[in-house]
Amino acid sequence: MSWLLGYVDPTEPSFVAAVLTIVFNPLFWNVVARWEQRTRKLSRAFGSPYLACYSLGSIILLLNILRSHCFTQAMMSQPKMEGLDSHTIYFLGLALLGWGLVFVLSSFYALGFTGTFLGDYFGILKESRVTTFPFSVLDNPMYWGSTANYLGWALMHASPTGLLLTVLVALVYVVALLFEEPFTAEIYRRKATRLHKRS
């Protein structure tokens, strides 16, 4: 990891912006979703849990676009690494980008908009937890697909800065999952218990 730091200026404004957006995004959506789950204030303000979820999801999408823009700007503002600047590495990056897109898009298809964007915090639950592809081959495929996208993008640009930021993306997702996974497991456990009692 230390060899990357020789190529990265952590004080460069676009790098700082990328770090801030990478850290802020999951923090924002987890704080807002937990607040909604406890208070239902967004659902009341919008008059519907669905409208509230769609609104939060739209904000998350815009924040993710901003994060990707800042990530790209940070890479472009810092030097490439000669050892990564080859056709082999470029096509490896392209393959990772493609793999990541498959997992992100198939996750979205399996979950739908509300399933992707924290609908369970709004009381919008599916019949049961999704276990079809890509969830049948990988836990949290949306997050790991997104991480693969950033890794692929960094390799395609031969960017040590991109690699370092990708590590940060992965770490932030791991921390987010420490909060999200227990909640999701518990909420579907409660639903299963309620259904069992009714039957």
Curated annotation (Swiss-Prot):
Keywords in alphabetical order: Endoplasmic reticulum, Lipid biosynthesis, Lipid metabolism, Membrane, Methyltransferase, Mitochondrion, Phospholipid biosynthesis, Phospholipid metabolism, S-adenosyl-L-methionine, Transferase, Transmembrane, Transmembrane helix
Binding-site list for S-adenosyl-L-methionine: 98-100, 180-181
Membrane-spanning residues: 46-66, 94-114, 158-178
Intramembrane parts of the chain: 13-33
Cytoplasmic membrane side: 67-93, 179-199
A single Gene Ontology CC term: mitochondrial membrane
Entry keyword Cytoplasm: no
Gene Ontology MF term list: phosphatidyl-N-methylethanolamine N-methyltransferase activity; phosphatidylethanolamine binding; phosphatidylethanolamine N-methyltransferase activity; S-adenosylmethionine-dependent methyltransferase activity
PROSITE patterns the record matches: SAM_PEMT_PEM2
Reaction(s) catalysed by this chain's protein: a 1,2-diacyl-sn-glycero-3-phosphoethanolamine + S-adenosyl-L-methionine = a 1,2-diacyl-sn-glycero-3-phospho-N-methylethanolamine + S-adenosyl-L-homocysteine + H(+); a 1,2-diacyl-sn-glycero-3-phospho-N-methylethanolamine + S-adenosyl-L-methionine = a 1,2-diacyl-sn-glycero-3-phospho-N,N-dimethylethanolamine + S-adenosyl-L-homocysteine + H(+); a 1,2-diacyl-sn-glycero-3-phospho-N,N-dimethylethanolamine + S-adenosyl-L-methionine = a 1,2-diacyl-sn-glycero-3-phosphocholine + S-adenosyl-L-homocysteine + H(+); 1,2-di-(9Z-octadecenoyl)-sn-glycero-3-phosphoethanolamine + S-adenosyl-L-methionine = 1,2-di-(9Z-octadecenoyl)-sn-glycero-3-phospho-N-methylethanolamine + S-adenosyl-L-homocysteine + H(+)
E.C. no: 2.1.1.17, 2.1.1.71
Entry's family note: Belongs to the class VI-like SAM-binding methyltransferase superfamily. PEMT/PEM2 methyltransferase family.
Reported function: Catalyzes the three sequential steps of the methylation pathway for the biosynthesis of phosphatidylcholine, a critical and essential component for membrane structure.
Protein name per its UniProtKB record: Phosphatidylethanolamine N-methyltransferase
Taxonomic lineage from the root: Eukaryota, Metazoa, Chordata, Craniata, Vertebrata
